[in-house]
Design a protein with these regions (language model features):
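Amphipathic, small/basic residue-rich leader segments at the start of a protein or domain
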Residues: 1-123, 147
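Short, well-ordered loop/turn and helix-capping segments at boundaries between secondary-structure elements
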Residues: 19-20, 117, 134-142, 154, ...
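Core alpha/beta catalytic barrel or barrel-like domain that forms the active/cofactor pocket
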Residues: 91-96, 118-133, 155-165
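Short helix/loop capping segments that flank catalytic or ligand/cofactor-binding pockets
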Residues: 93, 101-104, 170-172, 201-203, ...
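Short, flexible loop/turn elements at secondary-structure junctions
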Residues: 98, 165-167, 183, 197, ...
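Internal maturation/activation junctions in enzymes
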Residues: 129, 140-182, 186
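A short core secondary-structure module
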Residues: 189-220
Length: 220
């Protein structure tokens, strides 16, 4: 398939709807100047059209393969993901203290919009990683942030969200998985997870060195 990015429309939406110019007036997002924003929006459009869109059909025809417990992606996916990471697209809005660029999340949304329009199945990989980064940045302990964020932000590791259960699909509120705090012993302060999760998007693949699974569970 071919993909033609709607760069000018996206720039208009980012300026008018997302208020990027107002964000850039703050100290936190001062780097989000017009020239940089245009370079990001134009650059990711070209990248999505040139590297991810052509793999849409490849993914349909070849598909992923599971052999001896190892999931292998079709030809071209590993190189495209490596280029995505090398060019810094995964780190656009990642916290600067963990190797990210610290830019407004609006720009990460634009990256994901372009990648998703070009190849939605492939785009779910970075989308889930960005979600894991956001969750850990806002809710993770300092220890968890130090352990996981640098490699998630760099793209060396990827992330997932473990929500779906046999009886809880779109009705996430029906989940039964529980998390019980361990109070004693060598694992004190951690949680014992009990339950079953299924249909974990990008739950196994060969593109990242490690996959971090965020599990949704109920506390007692």
């Amino acid at each position: 398939m071919t993909y033609t990015p709607a760069t000018q429309d996206q720039l208009l939406a980012i300026r008018v709807n997302a208020g990027i110019e107002e964000l850039a007036q703050s100290e936190k997002f001062a780097a989000a100047e017009p020239d940089l924003v245009e370079a990001i929006v134009g650059g990711i459009g070209e990248f999505a059209a040139g590297e991810w869109a052509p793999l849409n059909r490849v993914g349909d025809l070849e598909g992923a393969k599971l052999e001896n417990g190892v999931v292998t992606l079709p030809d071209g996916f590993a190189a495209a993901y490596e280029h995505y990471v090398e060019q810094g697209w995964n780190a656009i809005s990642g916290p600067a203290e963990f190797g990210g660029q610290g830019l407004p999340f609006t720009l990460s949304c634009n990256v994901l919009e372009n990648l998703g329009t070009a190849n939605m199945a492939f785009n779910l990989l970075p989308m889930l990683s960005v979600g894991a980064i956001e969750s850990l940045e806002h809710h993770g302990s300092p220890e968890l942030q130090q352990k996981y964020l640098p490699k998630l932000v760099s793209g060396e590791w990827s992330g997932t969200m473990n929500l779906t259960e046999p009886q809880a699909g779109s009705d996430v509120g029906a989940l039964r998985t529980t998390a019980h705090l361990i109070e004693d012993g060598e694992h004190a302060g951690k949680y014992r997870i009990k339950g079953q999760k299924i249909y974990i998007t990008w739950g196994e693949h060969d593109l990242a060195k490690n996959i971090i699974h965020l599990v949704l569970a109920r506390l007692p």
